[in-house]
């Protein structure tokens, strides 16, 4: 290729990748050419001949393997890596015979690629090798010798993953037992390869200098050398002993090479490390050979002792020790005092240079191997050695690292013990070790807190213990005596430095702490040693352990080597002090020292009140609490105890110095108020108690102290100290369980609760410690038992519960947060800690109260959020404890039983608002989730059963639900009623309290959802009942026509908590639930029937599941209310056949009823209602059947006319009669819709006369509209009138033929007039009585059908109205009174709160608007020139209304920036304001369009002055959507333009509400469209004067959505125009928004192009002309300007503008004669007119023609008259 991002090189048609090239070559030729690197036999593995000469060999290698092997010879790392991975995969996947063919070629490749520079390649090579081994197994044996050297090197690779991969391959080939044999088999070849690498190879021989960079060559060489050295070591370790002799010669030759010994000084640390490892291995495995090379080994190793590289150091020191062990005369070849020791001293003085953990463990073995000859004089040598060693502790690195300092300290004590052991009896050395080393070292440590850790003191204790043990057991008296002297001397010196530290008046804190820690360790060395979590390697001296069998020693890896004469092991803790008793050699001096220090300390406390010495004394007494020490502390002071103490206490004081000290000193210190931290004083108390003889004495002392002497904080501290320590707890157990402390704590609880509630003073410092004390005694347990007696625990909990119970009843002003908070803390700790203790009865009462506080809203409890959170955590911890008690059950648990009853009462009897219910459900959620963890599987089911109401309780709650839900089903005809079950009370009900049925169903549904996670079994169909009741609640909410906000919130809460039918139905039995619903529907009807319809409609249940329940149609008869409602709800989902079956059951029943039966449910009313329900879905298409029923109804009128409520007073009508009338009217409406057969004249008369009579009844009974059935009667009456109006409005010539003669004229002249003469006054009356009632309210239900009917009113009927006169004083108008009355009556209704009224009024006024401008036209002359800018107002009624609306919209939209879209909630108050405003503007614009151009100018000036149009435009850009596209256009054909609110006409429907959310946006777009179309100049003026941001928003929106529509309409008007121009043709191009006019005069063509801008009509229209013909420049410009101005600023159309322009041109050329020379009006070249006139004949000629005539004829005469021209 031509490189990255370049074109392929010309002619380079084959792939550039080497792998792909090889693959292509193999495909073309069938073989791969031979290449260097593979041998033809086992003896010669270096060369592979060309394949053409060795087909028989190459045929053994698979072609895919050939390809991969070829890739492996490439230099590219990626190619090699992928090839090796591919090779490994192929080895795994191919059969063994195929893979075996690769073996002859593998060794050469492996040997080369295993040394590759890239570590990934090396790792992949070893991984592939392992796969090859696993496949070929023993077949690899012939090739081992060629491989083994490099294989061993690979196992020592410096890249660990590669080394591990090589070891894995080696282990896959050879089990551990066979590995030595394999190495022995190849030992000569291995040695040869490794020696060559070490002696012969160089960077340039290993890598090609021509192609490999120097840095890479050197790196590879260093790695190869390192691996070779390590491989030699591995060879030595793996080889059996009997094979070593055969390699001596080869190793001799290696060791004879100076190059080998130079590796010890190599600059690369990895090489030096590998070198020293090899030296160690050689010393161990071939010691004789190393002895021979002593002169080279010794300097090479010992003189490198100061090498501080972390890589080299471990191997170096290992080599040092092996050298000292193997070569006895090594010191002959180096100068120890001048060369080795100074280097060693420097290293250890510097703390090992950061390698103390590596170097210092080797120091003891090192000095143990030093011959005496080179350490003389011993005193100086050991003194310098130890001094240097201690100096290492002073380095920064050692101070900051605990591991480093531990290593130094450990080495110091090991060496000190060794030197002491070796030189015992030599006083100078003994003195030096104690006086100059050990004591100064301890003194330095006591001063430095950084060194005061357990390791140092443990080592000291261990050293002393070993000396003491040896002195006790040593048989040699001299040695024992020497050791005793050393110990005596040590204790004397130690006593001196300790006394000196404590005797300082201002004792150093660190020193005092150090002394106390030291004494503790010396007192209890074993226990302190146990505190050390990590076991450290210790040195065990030869005389302390049995000699190990040296013959079994074997060379292992460098970690944990065993070397002759010394051994690293883990020493057990003090063997001789296992009993815990101190040696007499330590006990007496230690006690003497303690007494001295105690005496010094108490003196400082008494004299100077030294806090520091008192703390030290506390620590001292903790370890040394004896009568002797307490006597020392009392000194010579006499007993001064108060005589009022009981006799028993007085005796104890006399007998026991510790008790005397307690009363005499300690109590006074404890009661000092200024002391904040007194925990150490309590420790002294415990030390004194230890000196009592028995528990009874201790209890007596503590009881006495509890009564009077001890404060609450002291008691708290005593108990706190007892909890974590079993020793201390054992001392005070009788006192804790006793009556004295128990009663005091109960009194404390009582005091705290009362004081906190009454005083209302929450002082944390005063109460917190006491509350903590209560919490402690309730929550702490020892061996699953309370600290104090159970009876006192019970009494304390009872007191806390009583306090909480009071809090629950307090008002907000009385509540006390602090008491609740403290009780929460106490209770939480109590519940959380009582894991092994059973809850007490009182604690369950407390738990219930906590739960109740959490399950109630903040408005009731008046508790802040933080306390509610605390309460929740507290009661949850209690419930969690309760359910995990093994023997807990529902019956035994007071809490579970009472909480269930309380929950049941809360939802049934209590008044809950949304917030309260949400809090309750949340608490129940927490409770039940905790109960789920119980092992009792029935617990949850029983709990839910306890909350579940019985059937009568459910029924009572259902009946208590308000009945307003019936409004919608009645209006929509889904249910029918013939009795008055309620009267609608429109007064505001409680707007917060939720009905109990809703709360109960929500609670139980939530409980069921949680319970069934664990497959809890509910009895007695409780699950189905709960789901049914939830569905009842949800359906009740859904059916409310205008649900209050709190009910909407209730439904939202259920959704958030996933309490939905979909979530519940998967848990229960659907068939069982459906059976339950059908049973209830058949029994009760109403909502139960609607629930079934809802489930079917939402596809929650299928029709197949429902069918079995209505299969027997006859079972629903005789009709009851339940059966009727069930059938009505099922009707929408029944098939035609099923509906016919039900209808067949009803039709016979409609015949022959008495008046009473006609109105009953099982009579005419019920059966007609079922028939109507079936007819609603147009499933009955039998015209004869419909006619038959109509005739039956007509017969009813004849037989029982008084049943028909014609023009009567409904207050006297019964609900049954109202019900049957409603069903008759409904049937007639449905009959009109679905009956296609013609009606007889008498039938038409019955329908229309009945309709008008029912409307009269409606009109006469407006006062009874509050009665639901009357309201429903009014609705269906108006519906029938509306349906009739729609029927006659939609009649065509075809349908008129089927109607009786004169029916249309009768309708128009009588019935239609009668309808509107009744409904128009009703509209005025109803809207006048109720100003602020929304259309969704039941009271305004009849507005929809009434208003829809009024939209059919004709203009003539409007103008002939009989409304009372309504005129406004000072209202300027040219309209006649009847018209002004109509405007003044209807226009204000555009502000009415109901949308149907607004739309109906709009439709009526819209019909009047075109008639109004003519009245202003008649009075146009009165608007003369007396005004500078004459203006005329549109109809005053509309403008006054507009003024009100502008103020309302300013409140709604004024604060919203222009361009920010406002979403108006449908049917809200703001919705009605905006709707009325926009409808008003549509009327004004309609009025404006109907006016003449003169009037439009006057109206425009008025709108400009009032700035109403500007306000409108600002509001429109807050209401129009950013994307005014119809949602359904997304799925339409993409090539078509999308439908927008500007392309689609707005249908202002009263009944259709599905598009309500888009109503305002669409209407706003419609108004904007009209404004741009009818008032473009005014919009353009506003746009140009607006600020830049608004300017851009308007421009962008108009260009994108409106301009194209208006441009298309303008262009289309040109294309469809019938106007014809003589001599001018007009063409329009819609795509380019251009209109081209072509004006033709003779042979001359003039083109005029008018182009509309992209933001039309905001931008200027461009007028272009190609040629100027026969007109002066200025005149031509004037014409163009006139046309442009007319189109842009005068709201003119394009056709009108073109007519204007043509008129100008025609006038210019009108009457112009032809030039008598060229016989044309316009000159053919310069387009001029004939202007030069002859003075004689007056004929005019073109100047150019005349000039040509003069020049060609050589005469200056007129061409026509031949007279001289000039």
UniProtKB/Swiss-Prot annotation:
Residue spans annotated as Zn fingers (RING-type) read 1715-1762
Report one GO cellular component.
RQC complex
Record PROSITE patterns: ZF_RING_2
Q: Which GO terms describe its molecular function?
A: ribosomal large subunit binding; ubiquitin protein ligase activity; zinc ion binding
Q: Which GO terms describe its biological process?
A: protein autoubiquitination; rescue of stalled ribosome; ribosome-associated ubiquitin-dependent protein catabolic process
Tell where it localizes: Cytoplasm, Cytosol
What Pfam families has UniProt attached to this entry? Ltn1_1st, LTN1_E3_ligase_5th, LTN1_E3_ligase_6th, UBC_like
UniProt pathway annotation = Protein modification; protein ubiquitination
User: Which regions are annotated as HEAT repeats?
Assistant: 59-96, 100-138, 273-314, 335-372, 380-418, 433-473, 513-551, 611-658, 676-714, 768-810, 911-949, 1068-1105, 1184-1227, 1314-1352, 1377-1414, 1475-1512
Catalysed reactions listed for this entry: S-ubiquitinyl-[E2 ubiquitin-conjugating enzyme]-L-cysteine + [acceptor protein]-L-lysine = [E2 ubiquitin-conjugating enzyme]-L-cysteine + N(6)-ubiquitinyl-[acceptor protein]-L-lysine
Query: What is the enzyme's main class?
Result: transferase
EC identifiers of the protein? 2.3.2.27
Q: Is this entry keyworded Metal-binding?
A: yes
Record-linked SUPFAM superfamilies: ARM repeat (SSF48371), RING/U-box (SSF57850)
Q: Which UniProt keywords apply?
A: Cytoplasm, Metal-binding, Repeat, Transferase, Ubl conjugation, Ubl conjugation pathway, Zinc, Zinc-finger
Q: What processing steps or modifications follow its translation?
A: Autoubiquitinated.
Function according to Swiss-Prot or TrEMBL = E3 ubiquitin-protein ligase component of the ribosome quality control complex (RQC), a ribosome-associated complex that mediates ubiquitination and extraction of incompletely synthesized nascent chains for proteasomal degradation. Within the RQC complex, LTN1 is recruited to stalled 60S ribosomal subunits by NEMF and mediates ubiquitination of stalled nascent chains. Ubiquitination leads to VCP/p97 recruitment for extraction and degradation of the incomplete translation product.
Subunit notes for this chain?
Component of the ribosome quality control complex (RQC), composed of the E3 ubiquitin ligase LTN1, TCF25 and NEMF associated with the 60S ribosomal subunit. The complex probably also contains VCP/p97 and its ubiquitin-binding cofactors.
For this chain, the family text in UniProt reads:
Belongs to the LTN1 family.
What is this protein identified as?
A: E3 ubiquitin-protein ligase listerin
**Source species, please?**
Homo sapiens (Human)
Q: Which gene encodes it?
A: LTN1
């Amino acid at each position: 290729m031509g490189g990255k991002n370049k074109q392929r090189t010309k002619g380079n048609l084959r792939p550039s990748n080497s792998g792909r090239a090889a693959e292509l070559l193999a495909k073309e030729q069938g073989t791969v050419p031979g290449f260097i690197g593979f041998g033809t036999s086992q003896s010669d593995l270096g060369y592979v001949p060309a394949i053409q000469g060795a087909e028989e060999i190459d045929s053994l290698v698979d072609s895919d393997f050939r390809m991969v092997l070829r890739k492996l010879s490439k230099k590219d790392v990626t190619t090699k890596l992928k090839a090796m991975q591919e090779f490994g995969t192929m080895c795994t996947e191919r059969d063994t015979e195929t893979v075996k063919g690769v073996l002859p070629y593998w060794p050469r490749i492996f040997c080369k690629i295993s040394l590759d520079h890239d570590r990934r390649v090396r790792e992949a090579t070893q991984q592939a090798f392992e796969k090859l081994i696993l496949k070929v197994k023993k077949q690899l044996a012939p090739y081992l010798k060629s491989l083994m050297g490099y294989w061993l090197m690979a196992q020592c690779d410096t890249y660990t993953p590669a080394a591990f991969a090589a070891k894995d391959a080696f282990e896959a080939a050879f089990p551990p037992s066979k590995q030595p044999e394999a190495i022995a088999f190849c030992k000569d070849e291995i040695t040869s390869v490794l020696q060559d690498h070490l002696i012969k190879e160089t960077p340039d021989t290993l890598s090609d200098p021509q192609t490999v960079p120097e840095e890479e060559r050197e790196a590879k060489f260093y790695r190869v050398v390192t691996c070779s050295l390590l491989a030699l070591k591995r060879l030595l370790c793996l080889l059996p002993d009997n094979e070593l002799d055969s390699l001596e010669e080869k190793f001799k030759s290696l060791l004879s090479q100076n190059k080998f010994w130079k590796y010890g000084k190599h600059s690369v640390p990895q090489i030096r490390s590998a070198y020293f490892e090899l030296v160690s291995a050689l010393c161990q495995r071939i010691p004789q050979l190393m002895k021979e090379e002593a002169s080279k080994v010794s300097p090479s190793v010992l003189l490198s002792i100061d090498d501080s590289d972390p890589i080299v150091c471990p191997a170096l020191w290992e080599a040092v020790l092996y050298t000292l062990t193997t070569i006895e005369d090594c010191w002959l070849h180096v100068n120890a005092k001048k060369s080795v020791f100074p280097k060693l001293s420097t290293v250890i003085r510097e703390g090992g240079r950061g390698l103390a953990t590596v170097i210092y463990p080797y120091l003891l073995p090192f000095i143990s191997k030093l011959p005496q000859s080179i350490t003389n004089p011993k005193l100086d040598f050991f003194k310098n050695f130890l001094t240097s060693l201690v100096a290492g502790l002073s380095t920064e690195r050692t101070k900051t690292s605990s591991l480093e300092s531990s290593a130094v300290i450990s080495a110091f004590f090991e060496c000190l013990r060794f030197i002491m052991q070796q030189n015992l009896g030599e006083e100078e050395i003994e003195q030096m070790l104690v006086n100059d080393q050990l004591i100064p070292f301890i003194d330095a440590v006591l001063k430095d807190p950084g060194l005061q850790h357990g390791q140092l003191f443990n080592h000291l204790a261990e050293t002393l213990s070993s000396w003491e043990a040896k002195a006790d057991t040593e048989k040699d008296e001299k040695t024992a005596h020497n050791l005793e002297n050393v110990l005596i001397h040590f204790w004397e010196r130690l006593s001196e430095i300790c006394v000196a530290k404590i005797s300082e008046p201002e004792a150093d804190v660190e020193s005092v702490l150090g002394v106390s820690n030291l004494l503790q360790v010396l007192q209890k060395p074993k226990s302190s040693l146990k505190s050390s979590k990590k076991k450290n390697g210790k040195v065990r001296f030869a005389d302390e352990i049995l000699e190990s069998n040296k013959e079994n020693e074997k060379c292992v890896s460098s970690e944990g080597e065993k070397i002759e004469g010394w051994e690293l092991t883990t020493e057990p803790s003090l063997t001789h002090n296992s009993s815990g008793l101190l040696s007499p050699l330590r006990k007496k001096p230690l006690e003497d020292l303690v007494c001295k220090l105690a005496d010094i300390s108490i003196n400082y406390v008494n004299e100077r009140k030294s806090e520091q010495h008192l703390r030290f004394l506390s620590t001292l007494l903790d370890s040394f609490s004896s009568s002797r020490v307490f006597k020392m502390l009392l000194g010579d002071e006499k007993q001064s105890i108060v005589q009022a103490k009981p006799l028993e206490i007085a005796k104890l004081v006399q007998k026991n110095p510790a008790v005397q000290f307690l009363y005499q000193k300690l109590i006074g210190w404890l009661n000092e108020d200024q002391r904040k931290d007194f925990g150490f004083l309590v420790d002294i108390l415990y030390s004194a108690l230890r000196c009592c003889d028995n528990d009874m004495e201790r209890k007596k002392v503590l009881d006495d102290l509890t009564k009077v002497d001890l404060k609450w904080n002291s008691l708290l501290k005593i108990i706190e100290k007892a909890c974590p320590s079993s020793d201390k707890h054992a001392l005070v157990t009788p006192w804790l369980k006793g009556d004295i402390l128990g009663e005091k704590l109960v009194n404390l609880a009582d005091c705290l609760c009362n004081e906190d509630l009454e005083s209302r003073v929450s002082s944390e410092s005063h109460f917190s410690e006491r509350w903590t004390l209560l919490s402690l005694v309730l929550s702490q347990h020892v061996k699953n038992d309370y600290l104090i007696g159970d009876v006192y625990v019970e009494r304390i909990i009872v007191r806390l519960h009583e306090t909480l119970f009071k809090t629950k009843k307090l008002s907000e002003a009385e509540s006390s947060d602090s008491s609740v908070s403290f009780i929460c803390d106490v209770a939480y700790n109590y519940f959380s800690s009582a894991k092994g203790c059973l809850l007490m009865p009182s604690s369950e009462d407390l738990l219930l109260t906590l739960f109740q506080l959490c399950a109630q809203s903040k408005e009731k409890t008046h508790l802040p959020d933080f306390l509610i959170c605390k309460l929740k955590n507290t009661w949850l911890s209690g419930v969690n404890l309760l359910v995990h008690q093994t023997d807990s059950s529902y019956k035994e648990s007071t809490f579970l039983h009472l909480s269930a009853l309380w929950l049941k009462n809360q939802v049934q009897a209590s008044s809950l608002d949304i917030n309260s219910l949400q809090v309750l459900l949340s608490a129940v959620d927490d409770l039940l989730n905790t109960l789920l963890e119980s092992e009792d599987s029935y617990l949850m089911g029983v709990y839910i059963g306890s909350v579940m109401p019985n059937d009568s309780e459910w029924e009572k709650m259902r009946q208590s639900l308000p009945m307003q839900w019936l409004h919608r089903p009645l209006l929509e005809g889904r249910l029918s009623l013939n009795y008055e079950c309620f009267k609608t009370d429109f007064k505001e009900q409680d707007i917060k309290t939720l009905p109990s049925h809703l709360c109960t169903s929500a609670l139980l549904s939530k409980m069921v959802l949680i319970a069934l996670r664990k497959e809890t079994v509910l009895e007695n169909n409780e699950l189905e009942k709960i789901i049914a009741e939830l569905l009842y609640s949800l359906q009740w909410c859904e059916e409310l026509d205008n649900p209050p906000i709190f009910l909407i919130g209730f439904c939202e809460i259920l959704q958030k908590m996933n309490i939905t039918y979909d979530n519940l139905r998967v848990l229960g039995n659907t068939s069982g639930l459906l059976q339950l619903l059908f049973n209830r529907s058949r029994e009760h009807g109403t909502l139960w029937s609607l629930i079934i319809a809802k489930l079917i409609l939402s596809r929650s249940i299928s029709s197949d599941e429902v069918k079995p329940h209505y299969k027997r149609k006859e079972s629903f008869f005789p009709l009851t209310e339940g059966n009727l409602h069930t059938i009505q709800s099922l009707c929408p989902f029944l098939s035609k056949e099923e509906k016919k079956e039900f209808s067949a059951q009803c039709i016979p029943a409609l015949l022959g009823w008495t008046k009473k039966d006609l109105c009953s449910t099982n009579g005419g009313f019920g059966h007609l209602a079922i028939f109507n329900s079936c007819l609603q879905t147009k499933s009955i298409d039998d015209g004869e059947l419909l006619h038959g029923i109509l005739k039956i109804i007509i017969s009813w009128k004849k037989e029982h006319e008084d049943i028909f409520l014609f023009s009567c007073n409904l207050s006297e009508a019964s609900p049954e009669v109202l019900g049957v009338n409603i069903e008759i009217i409904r049937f007639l409406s449905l009959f009109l819709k679905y009956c296609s057969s013609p009606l007889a004249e008498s039938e038409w008369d019955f329908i229309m006369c009945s309709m008008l009579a029912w409307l009269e009844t409606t009109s006469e009974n407006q006062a009874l509209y509050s009665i639901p059935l009357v309201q429903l009667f009014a609705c269906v009456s108006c519906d029938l009138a509306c349906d009739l109006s729609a029927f006659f409005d939609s009649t065509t010539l075809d349908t008129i033929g089927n109607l009786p003669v004169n029916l249309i004229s009768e309708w128009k002249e009588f019935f239609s007039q009668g309808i509107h003469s009744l409904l128009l006054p009703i509209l005025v009356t109803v809207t006048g009585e109720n100003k602020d009632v929304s259309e969704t309210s039941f009271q305004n239900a009849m507005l929809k059908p009434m208003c829809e009917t009024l939209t059919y009113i004709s203009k003539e009927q409007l103008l002939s109205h009989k409304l009372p006169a309504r005129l406004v004083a000072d209202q300027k108008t040219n309209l006649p009174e009847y018209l002004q009355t109509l405007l003044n009556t209807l226009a204000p209704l555009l502000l009415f709160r109901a949308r149907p009224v607004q739309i109906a009024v709009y439709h009526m006024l819209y019909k009047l608007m075109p008639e109004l401008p003519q009245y202003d036209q008649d009075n146009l002359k009165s608007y003369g020139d007396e005004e500078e800018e004459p203006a005329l107002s549109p109809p005053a009624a509309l403008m006054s209304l507009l003024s009100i609306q502008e103020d309302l919209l300013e409140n709604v939209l004024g604060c919203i920036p222009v361009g920010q879209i406002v979403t108006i909630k449908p049917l809200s108050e703001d919705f009605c304001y905006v709707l009325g405003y926009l409808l008003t503007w549509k009327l004004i614009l309609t009025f404006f369009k109907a006016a003449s151009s003169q009037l439009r100018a006057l109206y425009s000036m008025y709108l400009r002055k009032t700035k109403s149009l500007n306000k409108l435009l600002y509001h429109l850009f807050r209401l129009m959507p950013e994307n005014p596209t119809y949602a359904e256009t997304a799925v339409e054909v993409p090539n078509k333009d999308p439908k927008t609110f500007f392309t689609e006409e707005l249908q202002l429907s009263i009944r259709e509400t599905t598009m309500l959310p888009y109503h305002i946006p669409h209407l706003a777009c419609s108004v904007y469209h009209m404004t741009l179309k009818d008032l473009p100049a005014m919009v353009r003026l506003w746009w140009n004067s607006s600020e830049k941001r608004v300017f851009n928003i308007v421009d962008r929106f108009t260009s994108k959505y409106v301009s194209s529509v208006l441009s298309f309409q303008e262009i289309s008007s040109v294309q469809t125009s019938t106007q014809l121009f003589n001599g001018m043709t007009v063409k329009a191009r819609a795509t380019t928004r251009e209109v081209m006019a072509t004006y033709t005069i003779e042979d001359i063509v003039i083109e005029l192009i008018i182009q509309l801008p992209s933001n039309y009509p905001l931008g200027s229209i461009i007028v272009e002309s190609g040629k100027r013909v026969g007109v002066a420049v200025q005149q031509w410009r004037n014409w163009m300007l006139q046309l442009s101005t007319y189109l842009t600023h005068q709201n003119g159309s394009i056709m009108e503008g073109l007519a204007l322009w043509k008129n100008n041109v025609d006038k210019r050329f009108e009457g112009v004669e032809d030039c008598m020379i060229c016989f044309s009006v316009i000159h053919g070249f310069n387009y001029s007119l004939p202007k030069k006139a002859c003075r004689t004949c007056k004929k005019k000629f073109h100047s150019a023609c005349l000039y040509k005539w003069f020049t060609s004829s050589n005469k200056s005469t007129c061409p026509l008259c031949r007279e001289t021209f000039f």
